[in-house]
Amino acid sequence: MSHPVPALTYADCWKYHGRQAFWLTRHVSYRIGAVLALLASRLGLTPATLTLLSFITGVGGAFVVASFPQMPEAVAGLFLLVALHLSYGLDCADGVLARATRTTSPSGALLDKIADLLGSMLIPGILGIAAFGRQTSWADDLWHAFLVWWSMTPRLALTTITWIKEGMTPGIDRKGADDTREHTLFWKLKKFAGNLQDDVIYRTGVAVSWACGHYWDFILVFQGFCCLLLVVYLITSYLEIAASEKQK
């Protein structure tokens, strides 16, 4: 005789949050994600559905702002703040729901990565095109194609290379409790810098800078910071992997 599966609680969902996530993602977005995962379980939604909803919410929010240039920038910024953080909360919720319901799968993980990559390209791309003539005026005098490219590439490259490294070297823990590297000043600075490019800060920065009319100023500084992190990450990752291979 089969027994009914007990309904999930918030505690059940929170138990499966991403423990290796950056601090703000873990304590803000995964809190939102746990609530959304709980709601999804009550509605009978699948993790894949949450992944698609996350993609649609983020890209759709950017498209709405781009489609209504007459919208006051403060209103557009507030709309982006809600849409982008709801999208990220759903992105956190899909994995939480999958782990809580024991429905994780390679296909689900692949769908999540594809949606994340496409969203990372489409959201800044759409906003970048919409920003000309609406945001910081100095950007209108520069080569627009470069600015749109710059608005997405450094952070996207950093994220993608991080995923590649984690997939190829799963034994080298990046942020978790099993990190046995010496916690030097450089390690602490690198960890702090990594938290500064977290999705919570990025999405909040996009929304607030748009509301203030300084979107391109934020993008120029933030992506420049990500570019610097990318160089440091490539160098330190190579040295880290080379050192681990010598120990074998």
What are these regions (language model features)?
Residues 106-114:
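Membrane-interface alpha-helices at helix entry/exit sites of multi-pass transporters
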Residues 47-107, 124, 219:
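Membrane-embedded alpha-helical segments that form the functional core of polytopic membrane enzymes
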Residues 2-37, 113-248:
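A feature for the membrane-embedded catalytic helix bundles of lipid/isoprenoid biosynthetic enzymes
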Residues 39, 59-67, 204-208:
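Alpha-helical transmembrane segments of multipass membrane proteins
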Residues 37-48, 107-108, 190-193:
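Membrane interfacial helix-start motif at the N-side
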